[in-house]
């Protein structure tokens, strides 16, 4: 194990002992916010320190076995013990490396998932609907909560644009790799000649700001317009100006919400989505330099960056970032995404480990 890594683990062990002392004091719950911070930190450090203790025990076992090598009658036993201890140390060190990877501060946040139809007209809008169903089925499997924030339906039943809020443990950490361009190859329902068409949608996964106040938005920078909500094809579904369009003038970001009959609720939803979009923009600008120097699975935030192809005639899905092809498209479109997401998470961890190795 590298000295720098061991030094870090020793520091964490010392910190855990401090936390045990702080949490055992009688007045620990006097400040509930501080108590929650301490318990959260304790929960994060506990498994790491426990794993480190196992590594140290294995190192001690190896040292003890080395001392037995001088005894001819114990040599075979000692060599087995040394080999076993070293194997444990290698495995435990690899696990500790992953545990020490820098944690994305957004990983535990809820998300706004935005899907937009791109090239391909009606077929693209239908595929946007298919993608939405895929993510909703995945959310259902995770027991996450889903709330429709905004939708612009197409005439054939798909979506020109749709935004949902997904709330649940690890929502961002599991879905953050979905941002980018999604391409579909299939025979559209409207195609009479049986020809395969290619169309595309873009997906953006944005972490929800804890509070709107977390993102600084000057009210003077906002233009808020109200208009009548309308459904697919333009027919009015509401005779009052309940729909809300919020424009953030400095960035040009525009959010429309018209799903609720209450103008106040639509405005509140629009401001939440706006805060998430601004936060997402700031995040990608902040990491632009890093993304330029090394490949990043989360990407640049550029919607045109194609990340995945769904080929229906061949029943396959290919993720171009990690060169992974799965021939189980039907299950994937039904929300069975664990294998795909697991592969993306593993590759992301490998990227982080490589970058740490470069700087150590």
Curated annotation (Swiss-Prot):
Protein biosynthesis listed as a keyword: yes
Processing and modification events after translation: Methylated by PrmC. Methylation increases the termination efficiency of RF1.
InterPro entries: PCRF, Pep_chain_release_fac_I, Pep_chain_release_fac_I_sf, Prokaryotic/Mito_RF, RF-1
Principal location class: cytoplasm
Modified-residue entries (N5-methylglutamine), positions: 235
Cell compartments where the protein resides: Cytoplasm
Pfam families: PCRF, RF-1
GO cellular component, as recorded: cytoplasm
Keyword Protein biosynthesis: yes
GO molecular function: translation release factor activity, codon specific
Matches recorded under SMART domains: PCRF
Keywords: Cytoplasm, Methylation, Protein biosynthesis
Domain of life: Bacteria
Record family assignment: Belongs to the prokaryotic/mitochondrial release factor family.
HAMAP family to which the protein is assigned, alphabetical: Rel_fac_1
Task performed by this protein: Peptide chain release factor 1 directs the termination of translation in response to the peptide chain termination codons UAG and UAA.
Protein name, UniProt field: Peptide chain release factor 1
Lineage of producing organism: Bacteria, Pseudomonadati, Pseudomonadota, Betaproteobacteria, Burkholderiales
């Amino acid at each position: 194990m590298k000295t720098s890594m061991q030094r870090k683990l020793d520091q964490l062990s010392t910190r855990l002992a401090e936390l045990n002392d702080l949490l055992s004091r009688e007045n620990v719950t006097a400040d509930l916010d501080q108590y929650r911070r301490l318990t959260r930190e304790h929960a994060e450090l506990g498994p790491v320190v426990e794993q480190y203790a196992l590594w140290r025990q294995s190192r001690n076992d190896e040292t003890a076995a080395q001392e037995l090598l001088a005894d001819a009658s114990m040599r075979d036993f000692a060599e087995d013990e040394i080999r076993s201890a070293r194997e444990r140390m290698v495995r435990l060190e690899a696990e500790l490396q992953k545990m020490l990877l820098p944690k994305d501060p957004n990983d535990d946040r809820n998300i706004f998932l935005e899907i937009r139809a791109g090239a391909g007209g009606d077929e693209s809008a239908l595929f946007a609907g298919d993608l939405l169903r895929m993510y909703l089925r995945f959310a259902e499997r995770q027991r996450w909560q889903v709330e429709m924030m905004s939708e612009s339906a197409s005439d054939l039943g798909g979506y020109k644009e749709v935004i949902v809020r997904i709330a649940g443990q690890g929502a961002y950490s599991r879905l953050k790799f979905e941002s980018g361009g999604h391409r579909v190859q299939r025979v559209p329902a409207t195609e009479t000649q049986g020809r395969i068409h290619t169309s595309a949608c873009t997906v953006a996964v944005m972490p929800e700001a804890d509070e709107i106040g977390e993102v600084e938005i000057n009210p003077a920078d906002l233009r808020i317009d109200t208009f009548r909500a309308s459904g697919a094809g333009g027919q009015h579904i509401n005779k009052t100006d309940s729909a809300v369009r919020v424009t953030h003038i400095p960035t040009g970001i525009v959010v429309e919400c018209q799903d609720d009959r209450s103008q106040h609720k639509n405005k509140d939803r629009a401001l939440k989505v706006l805060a998430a979009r601004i936060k997402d923009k700031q995040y990608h600008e902040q990491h632009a330099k890093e993304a330029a120097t090394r490949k990043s699975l989360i990407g640049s935030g550029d919607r045109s960056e194609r990340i995945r192809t769904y080929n229906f005639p061949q029943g396959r899905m290919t993720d171009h970032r990690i060169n992974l092809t799965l021939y189980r498209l039907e299950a994937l479109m039904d929300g069975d995404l664990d294998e795909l997401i697991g592969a993306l998470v593993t590759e992301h961890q490998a990227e982080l480990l490589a970058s740490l190795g470069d700087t150590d």
